[in-house]
Structure formats: structure tokens, C-alpha cells
Amino acid sequence: MEELQGYLEKDRSRQQHFLYPLLFQEYIYTLAYDHGLNGSIFYEPMEILSYDNKSSSVLVKHLITRMYQQNYLIYSINDSSQNRFVGHNNYFYSHFYSQMVSEGFAVIAEIPFSMRLVPSFEEKEIPKSQNLRSIHSIFPFLEDKLSHLNYVLDILIPYPIHLEILVQILQCRIQDVPSLHLLRLFLHEYHNWRSFITSNKSIYVFSKENKRLFRLLYNSYVSEYEFLFIYIRKQSYNLRPTSSRAFLERIHFYVKIEHFIIVCHNYFQKTLRFFKDSFMHYIRYQGKAILASRGTYLLIKKWKCYLVNFWQYYLYFWSKPYRIHINQLSNYSFYFMGYISSVLINPSAVKNQMLENLFLVDTVTKKFDTIVPVIPLIGSLSKAKFCTVAGHPISKPVWADLSDSDIIERFGRICRNLSHYHSGSSKKQSLYRIKYILRLSCARTLARKHKSTVRNLLQRLDSGLLEEFFTEEEQVICLILPKTTLFTLHGSHGERIWYLDIIRIDDLANSLDWS
């Protein structure tokens, strides 16, 4: 606890006190809406609203001018339900401006975290490589580790029971009272916050609006709860993690710390010896985490009970036991990062001969396996209006007004992205089915536009349409083997490939509804 208190005292000197005036600076909104910006340390650049760069500067100037007016922010947010600005009935909508402010606030709120993380990265001399950000790099790690483990905890991250908890977590970094009040306004006035906090689906399904702000809050919140896991690991193994980062809330912390001291003295030393496991691995992506162990079922069950009780009673996080599932790797599979993963057991017999004696030795090998969840993926395609619920391709009427090249390019890009991300699947047949759905949906969309039949359209555009749906690795194979057809390509290309340039899950794979 002395080490923890020393960390808190040292960290207070880095708190930011004057962030609110930055909301009146035009360059802040340029950073928030720069689609090519790679400076964000938490997430990728994204499209917020569809407007061109020429009009965006005009919008920002109008916004800053009105923000200088007294109580404008309060009026604009409260007036968002009426969809108009104060004094402007037919001009820009209040909802649009308040969304711009929230995105600018998110950029400002990132500053304290970036000031803390960037120096630590420089001290550790982490090379500036895009490959370090690839989420596909997690799967080779799982291949290497999970085949030697027995159980896995499949965890859905608990969510806070009150919005004020999110504000308090940010108070560890932001002491600017006006900024915190503005954050409370956004959380309580927007209609979509409830789906973000109390959704029955996985918590990483964020609201479509104010993504940057909500993701900042979510990352801060998850860092708070993960500190508990890091602390337990330190106490049980007496090892100092070198790659962990923890953000702790300071407000009301000393109320919690009294309970923490009691637990440490009266409970930790007696129970942590039951949690010693040198083969324990924890991996999280967005709202899903897995905790894998080589220990027994009793040990992993203790971890589950311990985490649930500690989250609920000492950190005031609402976590229900059914959000944590215990799976034996040899008998069950688990869903993580768009794949259904499992550990396959392959028994085999080895013939050995020593002198004149011949005998058989039964051996068992374990292999980490990943496959594409085809049924949920078809469900995502159905929601996006590419096919029916049964998986029958249909046309996309909303794209029928585009040019032929734009339609083919859009379908081809979706197909290539899905193929690129799911290239690590050990069973390619389900992936080929998805590509078939997208290709035929593209053909039916073009046929709908030209009022023709799919057969006639495919005869006219088959070669060009097929090339658009080739992935990079398939194009390389076709260059090496010019006589390779599509069907022989499907049969020969069955190896799993993990790419080091994938920094996010495809939107269709990310929207899978798994309970």
C-alpha cells in the first residue's frame, strides 16, 4: 500500500488544471475532424458527419462565436431535442454543434493521458512500428500459449452502475471544473448514453455519435478495473509487470483504500497462495477479455468468484457472475476478436522399436484452432441488407444510384476487408460462402440498376467483377500459378495467415451479436 500511495503522490503533479479554454481554439476541432490524423493514442480516425473540409472551417468559426455567448453551451445542448439553434430556426441544428463540441472535448481530454504515456514509451525505447499495433499479432501469442493451458475465463467487462463513476475516473487526470461539468452535460443530455452503459449486448457496441468521447471514457474505465488484476498479480507473484499501464481515480479513493488495507492485511496473505499460477495469461480487446490458466477447475473458479466480489464490493463495479464463463479448452470453444477459438486434441500412435521389441506409444498433441463464425456473420450481412436471414443474396437498393465502378468497388472493399481479417481461419469454406454472398449481391445490385438479369450481367462483367473480389494473397498465387482457377485456388489455399497491418476489427465482424 505504501508503494501505491507513493504512486498517487507522484502522479498528482501531472494533473491538468486549464483545459476548458482550449475549447475556444479552432485547431482543436481541426484535430478532431482530421480523417488522416494518426496522433490519437486510443483509436483510429473515423468519419463523424458527412461534410466537406471547406465548410468545416466555417462551421467551427460559427461554433466558437456562439460559444463566447453567455450560457450558449447549456442552451444548445438543452435545445438539441428541438433540433434548432438559439435564434436560428432554419439554420444549423443544435445537435450538430453539440456533437462538434463533444468531439473537441475528447481531443482535449486525451492530452493528460498522452502526456503520461508518450514519455513512458520513449523511456522503454519502444520502436515506432505500425506492426506493434496489429491486433492480429495477438493470435500467434494465443497459438503459442493456449495449447499448454487447461481453462479459460470468458469475461464480459462489467459496466458502471452510475454515470458519475465515469466522471470520477477522469478526475484523476482533469482538475478543470468547467470541463468536468461540461462532461456531465454530455452524459446526461444525450439520448444515446443509456444504450452505451446499460446495453444487454457487449459493451463495446458504442453509440454511433460521439464515438471519440465515449471511447475515451470507456478506456479510462477499463484501465481502472484492470488495475485490480495488476495489483493481485504483483502481490501473488512478486513480479513487477513491465508493460502494464493503470489509471486510478483519486476522488473517493481514500474511502476505498481503507477497505483495501483491511483486505490486504486480513485476507490477501491467507488467500493469495491459492491463486499462485505461473501459467496465467490475460488478454483484452474492447469489451471482451479472456483469462487463461494451466491450473485446475477449482483454481479458475476461485479467480471468478474473487474478481466478481472484488469488483462489486471494493470498486463499486456492477458485475454479475453470468458475465464470466469458465470453459475447458479441450472441450469448449470461445468467441474472441471475430473468431471462434478452441484447442484441438489430436491423438496419435507412434511405433517404437528397441532391439527386438516393438511397441506403440500413444501421444496427444494440442493445436490452437480458429474458425470464422459463419452464422453470426451472415446475420450481420442480413442486417446490412446484403442477404436474407437464411443467407440468400439480395440487391442493395440504396447503392443502385451509384456508378458501376463505385458499386463494384464498395462490394469488393467489404469482401477484401472480411477476407483480410479472417485469413487466419483454418476452415476457408465458410469464408468463401461469405464472398459468394457479397459477389452475387453486387451482381444483383448492378442488374437492378440496369434493369437486366444477373446471368447477362455476369457474362458481360465476370472477369472484372471477379478481380475486385480477389484478396492480395489470392492475387499473388494467381501470378505465381497463371493457370490456377478460382476453384483450385479455394482448394489449395487453406493455411492460416496473420497480418501485421490490421489495427481494428472489421465493422461487420465487430457487430456480431454473441451472448
UniProtKB/Swiss-Prot annotation:
PANTHER family: MATURASE K. The keyword Isomerase does not apply. Pfam families: Intron_maturas2 (PF01348), MatK_N (PF01824). The gene is matK. InterPro entries: Domain_X (IPR024937), Maturase_MatK (IPR002866), Maturase_MatK_N (IPR024942). One of its GO terms (biological process) is mRNA processing. It comes from the Eukaryota. GO terms for cellular component: chloroplast. GO terms for molecular function: RNA binding. This is Maturase K. It is found in: Plastid, Chloroplast. Usually encoded in the trnK tRNA gene intron. Probably assists in splicing its own and other chloroplast group II introns. It comes from Helonias bullata. Keywords: Chloroplast, mRNA processing, Plastid, RNA-binding, tRNA processing. Belongs to the intron maturase 2 family. MatK subfamily.
